[in-house]
Amino acid sequence: MDKQAAERRIQELHKEINRHNYLYYVEDRPEINDAEYDLLLRELQQLEKAYPDLVTADSPTQRVGAAPLEKFSQVTHRMPMLSLENAFNEEEMHDFDERIKRFLGLAAGDEIEYVCEPKMDGLAVELVYENGDFTVGSTRGDGYVGEDVTQNLRTVKTIPLSLAIATPPRLFEVRGEVYLGLAPFQKLNVEREEAGDPPFANPRNAAAGSLRQLDSRITARRPLSIFCYAAGSLEGHEFTSQSDLLNTIPGWGLPVNPLIRKVSGIGGVLAYYHEMSEKRESLPYEIDGVVVKVDSFDLQRELGEKTRSPRWAIAWKFPPRQAVTVVEEIVPQVGRTGVITPVAHLRPVEVSGVMVSRATLHNWEEMEKKDIRKGDTVVVERAGDVIPAVVKVITEKRKGDEQPLPIPANCPECGSEVVKIPGEVAVRCLGLSCPAQIRETIIHFASRHAMDIDGMGDKYIEQLLKLGLVKNVADLYYLKKDDFMRFERMGDKLAENLLGAIETSKQRELSRFIYALGIRHVGEHTAKLLANAFGSMENLEHASEEELLSIREVGPQVAQSIRTFFHNRNNIEVIDRMFNAGVKPSVEEKRVGGRFTGKTFVFTGALTRFTRDDAKRMVENEGGHAAGSVSKKTDFVVAGAEAGSKLDKARQLGVKVLTEDEFLAMLGVCRT
């Protein structure tokens, strides 16, 4: 290919890859699978390698991160990024509304048009676009001067490197909130704890810590996202209102929270706040309140600013998700990788409608830093963690008999030596045959998202270990009915059901099998990437580090962990024993041209004909996409019993609603 043809193809690839990035990261409705995406990216990389002078700053290949910086330089904001005044109750919101009316000379009965937005709990940033190209990105800082984090922001997949508009503004400063979703946050903390690093306290700290990395390659490995919500300086374009801005910029490629809404009067604001308060627990990211802004930019200019905040906006904060209780015991808990975690057993207390009786203390360094002891009165919080965390000790309530828990010299499960590896915060059991590690490994292997051995719960696994019937996951596939009949209160039918569930699990998808192996740093998503890339266990076992690193989202740490796992002879022997017992993982290809190609489904309510995981698989196998929330882009909502807000929204948007039987009929499955 000559240079002219290469340049044309590079431009085509830019457009195609950017479009797929937008579909994948912003709209959550990919049109191609990861393997097809990787082929496009690899083609672009090869062309740029052949013609390095054709590499442009907005190329999709330039998101991988640059060499580490020694320190961040400073950026002065052309327009200050002011903080917002806070409100904490309805009375203060009524006061805000009345102040605006008085300032504008309006009558008490007049209604202001407001725009209400979920208050994201992340890190505020400013993106500068010059003639449509992203040139500078900075943190809010003190509102006047922030830190230059351009290289890090370039790695955030939801930030366009160039605006999708034919005639872009000469200058456009857009403000937004960089955040980390709850699922990526929990996964990141698991990986950090397994690697011996301190976990992040909450998603906001994780987002801030990820964005303020001097090495942007670290930022690139963390799935940060952004929602844009305001404009700074603007030349060459004009918006008339906040709603005009937020309705326009998604078409330019800038993500906006779909829950933003224009309302009339303070009554509309109150209704929106209470709706978001109810939705808060079901959202895939953290919000800590609602931001309310006067919609009209003319009115905003008339209202102006106070010393540190605008008169035309306010943040109505949610009540904190905290409670006070007592630490009744601190117990060391051994995980499947040998990491020993101190866990606080608490006097039961309700936090955000959930009864809490345990909280992770993460590690001994964290516990000692907070000085948490048995008998302490503490503040606990639910902030993105499945298991709540202890925020602080109320030291003034100490009586003098509180007891700290020292690092155990020996594993509480097997008595093996316990070590703290230099450079890590984790304390680990070195026992190769530690029953706690074996137990947790088998529980993980049999779990619903792994091999899904129906009925094989924790109690049965503990009995198998106690009776010496299993020593590793391969032993599950050599069990006989007589083995289960040794259990307490075990009948013929139940034993046969368990054996049947084990037999059924032999045909699970390759991605589930990879995830079930419990390879360090390999979660469900990475397991799917590996299954799609290599297609068989044999190929994965023999994959080189270079081949692993060529996969999108697989970094050096993950690649090294995979290589280490497959270099362990014991692991290979366990896998071989499973294959000899008839385990045969299958690769389920996403069908191109399936009956659901290009269609988006949402499942809601209590499903009786299939599980949500089964539904997602059925849709994806037919080329469709299963989403978690209803939007204008949703094609079908499948509603089970007691369907709630998703069903209501589907009806409001005119989305077609199906029963479970109607969905199965679309698949050609007979009703029973």
From Swiss-Prot:
GO cellular component: cytosol
UniProt KW keywords: DNA damage, DNA repair, DNA replication, Ligase, Magnesium, Manganese, Metal-binding, NAD, Zinc
Binding site for NAD(+): D34, A35, E36, Y37, D38, S83, L84, E117, R140, E177, K293, K317
Catalytic activity, EC: 6.5.1.2
Cofactor entry: Mg(2+); Mn(2+)
Matching SMART domains: BRCT (SM00292), HhH1 (SM00278), LIGANc (SM00532)
Entry-linked CDD domains: BRCT_DNA_ligase_like, LIGANc
Entry annotated with the keyword Ligase: yes
Binding site for Zn(2+): C411, C414, C429, C434
Matches recorded under InterPro entries: BRCT_dom, BRCT_dom_sf, DisA/LigA_HHH, DNA_ligase, DNA_ligase_AS, DNA_ligase_CS, DNAligase_adenylation, DNAligase_N
Domain of life the protein comes from: Bacteria
Reaction(s) the record says it catalyses: NAD(+) + (deoxyribonucleotide)n-3'-hydroxyl + 5'-phospho-(deoxyribonucleotide)m = (deoxyribonucleotide)n+m + AMP + beta-nicotinamide D-nucleotide
Chain ranges of the BRCT domain: 591-672
GO BP terms, alphabetized: DNA repair; DNA replication
Molecular function terms, GO-annotated: DNA binding; DNA ligase (NAD+) activity; metal ion binding
Entries under Pfam families matching the protein: BRCT (PF00533), DNA_ligase_aden (PF01653), DNA_ligase_OB (PF03120), DNA_ligase_ZBD (PF03119), HHH_2 (PF12826), HHH_5 (PF14520), Nlig-Ia (PF22745)
The keyword NAD is assigned to this record: yes
Active site per the UniProt annotation: K119
Role summary: DNA ligase that catalyzes the formation of phosphodiester linkages between 5'-phosphoryl and 3'-hydroxyl groups in double-stranded DNA using NAD as a coenzyme and as the energy source for the reaction. It is essential for DNA replication and repair of damaged DNA.
HAMAP family, sorted: DNA_ligase_A
Family: Belongs to the NAD-dependent DNA ligase family. LigA subfamily.
Annotated protein name in UniProt: DNA ligase
The species this protein was found in: Geotalea uraniireducens (strain Rf4)
Taxonomic placement: Bacteria, Pseudomonadati, Thermodesulfobacteriota, Desulfuromonadia, Geobacterales
Gene responsible for this protein: ligA
